[in-house]
Curated annotation (Swiss-Prot):
UniProt cofactor(s): Mg(2+); Mn(2+)
Example of a GO MF term: NADPH binding
The protein, known as: 1-deoxy-D-xylulose 5-phosphate reductoisomerase
Organism lineage: Bacteria, Bacillati, Actinomycetota, Actinomycetes, Mycobacteriales
Keywords from the UniProt entry: Isoprene biosynthesis, Manganese, Metal-binding, NADP, Oxidoreductase
EC number of this enzyme: 1.1.1.267
Residues that, per the record, bind 1-deoxy-D-xylulose 5-phosphate: 128, 152-153, 177, 200, 213, 218-219, 222
Role according to the record: Catalyzes the NADPH-dependent rearrangement and reduction of 1-deoxy-D-xylulose-5-phosphate (DXP) to 2-C-methyl-D-erythritol 4-phosphate (MEP).
GO BP annotations, alphabetical order: isopentenyl diphosphate biosynthetic process, methylerythritol 4-phosphate pathway involved in terpenoid biosynthetic process
Catalytic activity: 2-C-methyl-D-erythritol 4-phosphate + NADP(+) = 1-deoxy-D-xylulose 5-phosphate + NADPH + H(+)
Length: 402
């Protein structure tokens, strides 16, 4: 059973890294390696698609508690303690840790998230999909302050909110880089290729997060996550485009003050803060250099060309399992785009199609099975939409719902 304590016998925090071979996981291991007096790795988990990286991590960290979800990959690796679809969850349940970093990709992170919360460990959450999909279940399972966000935007909000009391908050402002297609027209987006969508202008991320950032679905997920993490109504959460990605989010208070968190785009800063919260890790990232001339731009998000955020707001305000439906529909549509089956705008068009038909899921889930049922339905509905998707039809569906 994972147990949250003040750390190991030597005072270091014991960290379990889920999704260790991905972008967040590899950077987290670099942060841990650079601060051996603060952190130690006690377990690693990965899907198994990047086996060479996982084996190298095992050798570098010396850990023996390892989970691989893909059984074939686990057999190739040899001497893997936890194998199969439930391997990651069992690793969380049976490994003593103070911090569980969930950097898994997709809604498969839900059960490990719930297991980490049940253990009492601090959850450093990078797997936004588990919170978006699990919503009420995750919040019910969490103790106050147990979840610390890893996303740069939510890490920024957590820092800014320390400047006032909850009743003094007027609104939260999420910033978005705008992605690689900022300023493009809807017609331009019809010709986007997977290669173009995989090139983010300011951040280095995994392929799924990069695609979600290009479609602005990522910002939609972050909008939902913001509401769930901080309890602020959707109408008091704004999204603005900030191409430089220096200001990561802002909080406006009732007296008119706006507090912003600014730093060069580097995920090691929010990762280090989530691992060591509330203590900061010296040297985690570069400072802003104000001795050099800079221009920071802010502009409104074009909801007509990029309707993913407003669709997420619709799903969140509707409630129930609708955010799980939003996420599952996106996962199916994104995979179809990467496979060349649909156009780039049809990703969000597919989400809109699925949400149009999802009234039955506007009921709060009683358990994980309810969430999984909603996601299963959404994936099936998304596949039907994908099969008949056309760019024109997709745009019409989005316009009808947003």
């Amino acid at each position: 059973m994972t147990t949250a304590t003040d750390g190991s016998a030597d005072g270091r925090l014991r960290v379990l890294v889920l999704g260790s071979t991905g972008s967040i996981g590899t950077q987290a291991l670099e942060v841990i390696a650079a601060n051996p007096d603060r952190f130690e790795v006690v377990g690693l988990a990965a899907g198994g698609s990047n086996l060479d990286t996982l084996l190298r991590q095992r050798a570098e960290t010396g850990v023996t508690e390892i989970a691989i979800a893909d059984e074939r990959a686990a057999q190739l690796a040899g001497d893997i303690a936890y194998q199969g679809p439930d391997a990651v969850t069992r690793l969380v349940e049976e490994t003593e840790a103070d911090v569980v970093l969930n950097a898994l990709v997709g809604a498969l992170g839900l059960r490990p998230t719930l297991a980490a919360l049940a253990s009492g460990a601090r959850l450093a959450l990078a797997n936004k999909e588990s919170l978006v999909a699990g919503g009420p279940l995750v919040l019910q399972a969490a103790q106050p302050g147990q979840i610390v966000p890893v996303d740069s935007e939510h890490s920024a909000l957590a820092q800014c909110l320390r400047a006032g009391t909850p009743d003094e908050v007027a609104k939260l402002v999420l910033t978005a880089s705008g992605g690689p297609f900022r300023g493009w027209s809807a017609a331009d987006l019809q010709e986007v290729t997977p290669e173009q969508a995989g090139a983010h202008p300011t951040w280095s991320m995994g392929p799924m997060n990069t695609l979600n950032s290009a479609s602005l679905v990522n910002k939609g997920l972050e909008l939902i996550e913001t509401h769930l993490l901080f309890g602020i109504p959707y109408e008091r959460i704004e999204v603005v485009v900030h191409p430089q990605s220096i200001v990561h989010s802002m909080v406006t208070f009732v007296d008119g003050s706006t507090i912003a968190q600014a730093s060069p785009p580097d995920m090691k800063l929010p990762i280090s803060l989530a691992l060591g919260w509330p203590r900061r890790v010296p040297g985690a990232a570069r400072y802003c250099d104000f001795s050099q001339a800079q221009t920071w731009e802010f502009e409104p998000l074009d909801d007509e060309v990029f309707p993913a955020v407003e669709l997420a707001r619709h799903a969140g305000e509707t409630g129930g399992c609708m955010t799980a439906v939003y996420n599952a529909a996106n996962e199916e549509a994104a995979a179809a785009f990467l496979a060349g089956r649909i156009s780039f705008p049809a990703i969000v068009g597919t989400i809109a199609d699925v949400l149009h038909a999802a009234d039955q899921w506007a009921v709060s889930p009683a358990n994980v099975d309810d969430v999984l049922d909603a996601q299963r339905w959404a994936r099936q509905r998304a596949q039907r939409a994908i099969a008949k998707a056309s760019p024109a039809g997709a745009c019409e569906k989005v316009s009808g719902l947003a």
